[in-house]
Amino acid sequence: MKKWLPAVALVAAFVASLYVGATQIDNFWSALFNPDSNEILWQIRFPRVTAAVIVGAALAVAGLLAQGACNNAVAEPAILGTAAGASFGAVLAISAGLVQVGTIGAIACGTIGALLTTSLTFKLAAIRGALSSFGLILVGIAVSAIFTALVGIASAMVSRADARSISFWSFGSLALITPDNLIGVAITTVIGIAIAWKICRSKSAQ
């Protein structure tokens, strides 16, 4: 029974998140089973809450991969410089006028930045002979600090409006989620989790 408690809690939190909001939804339970009956519920709240669950799963897998790569329970993407690299890649592209905040281009640039900084962390750790779990974390913290500072510099180069947008976007928001781009989020996450599963299986077999 205990193994089902997290799933039950997730479903309960999901439904509660659909119900609670600035606007009261009349006949909530009826609207919940009739997608065409309430635009606020199905066009705004449902995509955002679903995206929150999907992104949460992706973050959990990312944390698991970081812990496995470093063999350290406290490792996470933020410590390895991955998060700072993602922010820097996106912010640099936005400040250069190549992409707009919240677009696929910004996400792609962020992904490239994350890959490059994570690779840099491992390369620097290898050069220093510090490929231990503790050494990787120390190098990752240094790389993260450097790229976080670079994000601040890049943000200072854009207009005040763009700087606010970048700041808001960097902290993360579900405000731009729609039923259309929710599909892209779901597909990308499923592919990423499948790749992570394959990596974990191959490592376990060694």
Where are these regions (language model features)?
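Alpha-helical transmembrane segments in inner-membrane proteins
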Residues: 1-206
